[in-house]
Amino acid sequence: MPTSADQPGVQLDQQNVAVEAPPDAAQRIEQLRADRMFSSDLSVGEFLLAREAGFEPLGVVVGSSVYHIGWQPQYMTVGSQYGYGFGYGYTYDDQELTVLTEAKLRARELAMSRMEAEANALGADGVIGVRLDVGEYEWGPGLAEFIAIGTAVRARGAAAGSYRTKFGKPFTSDLSGQDFRTLLHAGYRPLSLVLGVCVFAAYQNGWTFQQMSGWWGYGGVNQEVTQFTQATYSARELAMGRMQTEAANLGASGVVGMRYEMDTRLSKSDAEFRDEINETNAGAPANHWRSFVADLFAVGTAIAPLGADHEIPKPSLVLPLDG
């Protein structure tokens, strides 16, 4: 994942994250430490299972970043197009929108780094139950708020401090309290949340244009739109590959709980925007070239063995006596 130094005093680096918690967060954390109480977004069952696994919750930790996403240049090719007839001119290449990919990745890094900074201030060994949310503002085009939130935990007794990553950071995981306990009992420990992001655009070519144009001809039959299928494949593979690379860089043996979220949209063309603004279309349907955008986010928890000699307990059958 890329590194960043977007703000004074903020340095993002996968091996040495140095981000100070904001003053209000520092005050809240100091109060938690002084009162010797904890806060948690774990359920009652998750809380009890985390304690049974040897960890004490310390407090809810939060990181956020309101990020402006910049302008994306688009690359074109001179060539021929088949549509209704044959034409020659400029066409957009199917391509990753790297400016958008990088912006969404850096914003999530900032949010997670600030969450880790709060956990570090609490003396935590890690953060469990992490959620990553994104909110957009109607009043701010191009603005998005990226939020990371979870419960900081610390191992009890002699194990305290031993679950931090090899870089001295608290581990992060989106596993629930139940899954966290099961993972530890199976002889593995979480290392870090690993992310992969890709925003990919496919610009409607002549064949795709025919497939999607009206009820006559090719537009009136069931068929796969292969250009858009390929775009979703490309976005998925790029995002998952980046997530796997990040896990490998941490020395992980694998990734568990992996999930991906994909948002797809079909944009309006420049001509359609001009028609809406100038009202030159008079309600007539517009047959303009459009772009298909696949926005994909992959996330999971990288894990490593606790030790080579650990044996997984055999499952046992328990029969309730209360009927």
Where are these regions (language model features)?
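Short active-site-adjacent helix-start/loop capping segments
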Residues: 69-71, 136-137, 264-266
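Intrinsic disorder/low-complexity detector
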Residues: 2-100, 143-228, 269-323
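Catalytic micro-motifs at enzyme active sites that drive phosphoryl/nucleotidyl and oxygen chemistry
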Residues: 115, 132-141, 285-288
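Short, well-ordered alpha-helical segments
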Residues: 61, 75-81, 85-131, 210-269
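A solvent-exposed interaction/effector surface
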Residues: 131-132, 136, 140, 151, ...
